[in-house]
Regions:
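C-terminal beta-strand-loop-alpha-helix "lid" module of Rossmann-like NAD(P)-dependent dehydrogenases
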Residues: 1-218
Length: 218
């Protein structure tokens, strides 16, 4: 099977381990898939992942995206990635696509997450155990037909899933950067206090030494 892995990172740094965690998880996933005999290619989203994998796995990069700026460009940013993925999929370039991103948990917490994007992963866990499928299907009437509707909806679903991922990653990036800058400011404050104390002690010792020399000379 041919896989495409899409790591989603930020375009900028100064956000703690936000980018490195994505790159490490993607690297681990690629090696794991290759150990299982899979053929793996990459399509990094974000400069930090693109630059990292250009150094360590350049031969595996199928395409890449940077400066999507989802907070400004919105859904159009997701469409750029989605359209390229679907084009490659329908051309038979890959069988499965997995996206790796930082899932937003809170302003100070993000969780590295893997999600199968293509083909659509329909989990049975979302179904009610006591629901009769035949009874549910009997309620709905499809026009024109289920297959035609799915052909239209599935590409849109991929685009929406990517849009969701980009938004979560963007929110997580801002949270991670805020936390990183807060820690840096706190550490800088502690360093200033430490250096100020060291300076005052050195100055005091120097003055004491001069006084002793003056007294000794007198």
């Amino acid at each position: 099977q041919n896989y495409v892995v899409v790591p989603v990172s930020a375009d900028r740094g100064l956000c703690g381990g936000f980018n490195s965690s994505i790159n490490k998880e993607t690297f681990r996933l690629v090696k794991s898939l290759e150990d299982d005999g899979k053929n793996v290619q990459l399509m990094p989203v974000g400069k930090k992942s693109r630059d990292f994998f250009n150094r360590v796995m350049k031969d595996k990069i199928l395409d890449s995206f940077a400066d999507l700026n989802v907070s400004v460009n919105g859904y159009d940013a997701a469409l750029q990635v989605s359209n390229k993925l679907q084009e490659l999929y329908f051309d038979g370039k890959f069988d499965k696509c997995i996206i790796v991103f930082n899932k937003f948990k809170s302003a100070i917490s993000q969780e590295v997450t893997q999600q199968q994007l293509i083909p659509l992963d329909v989990s049975d866990s979302s179904k009610e155990e006591n629901v009769d499928d035949s009874a549910v299907k009997a309620i709905y009437d499809y026009e024109p037909d289920e297959e035609t509707i799915l052909k239209d909806l599935l590409p849109k679903n991929v685009s929406i899933q990517i849009f969701k991922v980009l938004l979560e990653s963007d929110a997580g990036e801002h949270g991670a950067r805020m936390a990183a800058m807060d820690n840096a400011t706190r550490n800088a404050g502690e360093m200033i206090d430490s250096l100020t104390l060291k300076y005052n002690r050195t100055r005091q010792a120097f003055i004491t030494k001069e006084l002793i020399e003056i007294i000794s000379g007198a």
